[in-house]
A protein has these predicted regions:
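Flavin-dependent oxidoreductase catalytic cores
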Residues: 1-425, 429-432, 444-445, 449-453, ...
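Asp/Glu-rich intrinsically disordered low-complexity tracts
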Residues: 21-24, 29-34, 411, 416, ...
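A short, basic/flexible loop-to-alpha-helix module at the beginning of a structural domain
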Residues: 399-416, 462-471, 580-597, 636-644
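A Rossmann-like FAD-binding core segment of flavoenzymes
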Residues: 431, 523-570, 589, 593-598, ...
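Glycine-rich dinucleotide-binding loop and its adjacent helix/turn
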Residues: 565-669, 756-768
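Hydrophobic anchor at the start of a short beta-strand
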Residues: 133, 248, 323, 497, ...
Length: 796
């Protein structure tokens, strides 16, 4: 059922999303900050709100975490927020708590009445690091759920929610009075717990916004004739409740992407200007009941997509209130460029700090290259579904698990020391953080300053691989995400690590995934893992063959061994008529477009290619990829693959991003493509990342035929035999070649030769990058616990 609900959520997001992506694509590239307006603030400059000073202008915004105990905040929340405070965040807004018991939108949604203790602990944990902490407060109204409360939903009018299909009761004076009182009581509780203020939610899923919008409010009373009346009443009650000297912030949806009746940017400008005198901070967001996925979309929506909207709202409020930019702000240089351009006064970098809780500290230390990148995949940080997954990050398994996953030595430095630019100090952070001298993000040329001493002091030359040396403490076989993370963690603990990778470039599945449209950011994570491993002194040997005899020799020398050899394809159909999907994505083949039939050309003898690009057509050129063979595995360079002329069938029994990406790539190369799935919609699992509806729109626009509710039975004689999953009726479609996007098998040759050897990632069971990095991390930690007595923990 949850998949159906999330699919519906994505479907409702179709309205207006195409225009959103088109408009966002017009935002100038903000890769390098420019000089901007005279006097523009720096991202690391302090900012004063309601008399309280935050150490910088980077916000860690409110989001669902599933870290709660019942409806109360837990010790896991405290550790989660404390890590971001220690990492330098200027302003932290806690997970939005319901202000009234009528609102229970998801099972572990906090209830403000149960949050006093949790807020108090969070405030105490974050205060020593200088961060200001606000309580997120809200009510989801008709966009909530009655599943947990067993009570009717509240709404301004009888608008049926597009996702739940529930119709709310129309709020009358008693419900409105209870709502206002609930906001006031929750705010008073937050203030009493020692928080610096509150943020009220009038965003895409909020009851306050529902009163603002002609889509959801058709009232004839004063709350309809003046759509801001309820918000004004709430603001006045909350201001009285928190008293003077505390921050009152508002998260305001300024474009519902439904111009026929919803809030438009022009209307929002008037609303913001009217509310600004009552506010200390205004965060500009986008989305509504038909476009919830526009709030925090995946990488198919360009970063900084709200910059134009924030700039318009900031102009409308004319300095009456500081404005925060939200919307896939994942790069500090781009955030600084937005401040330079006058688009905002602060930047909310929530997912960027889920990926790297020390983002600000690394900026202050002058090491932006060490920031773990957010790749905007939404795979594990988008957690609102009935499985109740705990928030985490595919790149940082410790995120969300701070109470159970100890920091590796390489990441365990105190934020206070980093703020002062001293990466060797382990001195505890203290209240003086906010008073530390501000280290500029960039030099006068607008480029980041690198920390050259890092590589030199860690013996970078030794990390280049090559010559023989003493036996390493750890030998890792496989340079995909699991192997690189294991190497990084083990080396960070002071171990001498050798990593052997059979292909020409490390990165494995991340490199292959980066070939998919709008998935280029995956390569940034591969680059980061490799760079961090080399910085920590890992010897990375490429085009290296490791045999079972090599494992025996290493074990005899006392070397710990970790296998991370990846996966291999399954041969389900005639191999003469089928191609493995990763052979295409990895760059083992290249699609071209010409008057002649499109052909696929093999990789060069060194195993590298330019990937799918060059003559590829379409709105987005795929990233270059430098990998071949069974990505992340031991299969070596791929054999030459030439796809014959004619229609291509992409078989996707998994329903993940691979099948959609391959179909898009082939269609962009001019091929006639059919995507076969047993599901009622293509890319079913993309519902978890918010890309499901968008993906189906892209496939439709690209001319891909979606053969849904279909099982692939055979491929022969230039056709594929499909069978309807419900009726059993069979039909044939043209098929010159089949691209297999199905489940894979472990590449376990070495493991079977030496059973019991520790292994991580796809060679255990093929899954996703998230599991690969998590298991690699765990084996790196385990190796560190067994490190030789003469090895000491590194402090770099």
């Amino acid at each position: 059922m949850w998949l159906v609900l999330v699919w519906l959520l994505g479907l409702t997001g179709l309205v207006g999303l195409v225009g959103l992506v088109d408009r966002a694509a017009e935002v100038p590239d903000a890769g390098v900050p420019d000089t901007g307006a005279a006097g523009a603030p720096r991202l690391l400059d302090p900012v004063t709100l309601a008399g309280r000073t935050a150490p910088c202008r980077v916000i860690f915004g409110p989001h669902e975490t599933n870290l709660g105990q019942g409806r109360a905040l837990s010790a896991r929340h405290t550790a989660y927020y404390q890590r971001r405070a220690a990492g330098g965040a200027g302003l932290i807004i806690t997970e939005t708590a319901s202000v009234h018991e009528s609102d229970w939108p998801y099972e572990r949604a906090p209830l403000a009445a149960d949050c006093a203790g949790g807020w108090r602990e969070i405030a105490a944990a974050c205060r020593p690091h200088g961060a200001l902490v606000l309580a997120g407060l809200g009510h989801t109204g008709l966009q909530g759920s009655s599943a947990y409360s067993q009570s009717v939903l509240w709404g301004p009018s009888g608008f049926t929610d597009a996702v739940s299909r529930e119709t709310p009761m129309i709020m009358e004076e008693p419900e409105i009075a209870a709502l206002v009182a609930g906001f006031a009581a929750a705010a008073a509780t937050a203030a009493g717990a020692g928080l610096d203020g509150v943020e009220l939610d009038a965003g895409p899923g909020a009851l306050l916004r529902q009163f603002h919008s002609g889509l959801t409010s058709q009232r004839a009373d004063r709350y309809g004739t003046d759509r801001l009346a309820l918000t004004r009443d709430v603001l006045a009650a909350v201001r009285t409740a928190i008293g003077p000297g505390r921050i009152l912030a508002l998260r305001l949806s300024c474009d519902e992407l439904a111009p026929w009746a919803g809030v438009t940017p022009e209307q929002a400008a008037d609303q913001a200007a009217a509310l600004a005198p009552d506010l200390d901070l205004l965060t500009v967001v986008r989305g509504g009941p038909y476009s919830a996925s526009a709030y925090r979309p995946d990488a198919h929506t360009p970063p900084m997509f709200n910059q134009d909207l924030a700039a318009a709202i900031r102009a409308a409020v004319a300095g009456a209130v500081p404005v925060a930019l939200q919307g896939s702000v994942v790069d500090a240089a781009a955030a600084q460029a937005a401040l330079d351009a006058g688009a905002a006064d602060l930047a909310e970098m929530t997912r960027a700090q889920i990926a790297d809780g020390e983002l600000v500290a690394k900026l202050r230390a002058g090491t932006p290259d060490r920031i773990r990148p957010c790749i905007l995949c939404n795979q594990t940080c988008r957690v609102r579904d009935n499985r109740n997954p705990v928030i985490t990050c595919i790149a940082d398994p410790r995120s969300g698990h701070e109470t159970t996953d100890p920091p590796p030595a390489a990441d365990a430095l105190a934020a206070g020391a980093r703020a002062a630019g001293d990466l060797t100090s382990a001195a505890p952070a203290g209240p003086a953080l906010a008073a530390q001298p501000i280290t500029p993000i960039s030099d006068q040329n607008g480029t980041y300053r690198s920390d050259q001493e890092e590589a030199e002091e860690r013996g970078q030359a030794g990390a280049e691989g090559g010559g023989p040396g003493p036996a390493p403490d750890v030998l890792i076989v496989g340079g995909g995400p699991a192997g690189l993370e294991a190497a990084r963690v083990a080396a960070g603990a002071g171990l001498v690590v050798r990593l052997a990778e059979r292909s020409a470039v490390p990165g494995g599945t991340l490199r292959a995934a980066a070939a998919g449209p709008a998935r280029e950011r995956m390569a940034a994570l591969a680059d980061w893992l490799e760079a961090e491993a080399r910085r920590l002194g890992v010897q990375i040997d490429l085009l290296a063959e490791i045999t079972a005899d090599d494992l025996d020799a290493a074990a005899e020398a006392g070397t710990q061994i970790i296998l991370a050899t990846g996966s291999r394809p399954v041969t389900r159909f005639d191999p003469a008529l089928s191609v493995d999907a990763l052979a295409i994505l990895s760059g083992a083949a290249r699609a071209t477009v010409a008057t002649a039939p499109a052909q696929f050309h093999a990789a060069g003898p060194d195993g590298t290619t330019a990937g799918l690009g060059g003559d590829a057509v379409g709105p987005r050129a795929p990233a270059q990829v430098h990998a071949a063979g069974a990505v992340g595995g031991p299969s070596g360079p791929a054999e030459a693959v030439t796809l014959p002329d004619g229609p291509v069938v992409v078989h996707d029994p998994v329903g993940g991003p691979i099948g959609v990406a391959v179909a898009e790539l082939l269609a962009a190369a001019g091929r006639q493509v059919s995507l076969v799935s047993q599901d009622p919609v293509a890319g079913t699992l993309l519902s978890l990342t918010g890309d499901l509806a968008d993906a189906n729109v892209r496939l439709q626009r690209a001319g891909v035929t979606r053969e849904l509710r279909s099982l692939l039975r055979e491929v022969s004689d230039g056709t594929a035999l499909l069978e309807d999953v419900w009726t059993g009726a069979q039909r044939r479609v043209g098929c010159a070649v089949l691209v297999d996007c199905g489940h894979r098998l472990p590449a376990e040759t070495l493991y079977l030769a030496r059973p019991g050897t520790p292994r991580a990632g796809d060679c255990v069971a093929p899954r996703t990058v998230a599991e690969a990095i998590r298991e690699g991390r765990r084996l790196g930690q385990a190796a560190a616990q067994r490190r030789p007595a003469d090895r000491t923990l590194l402090t770099r």
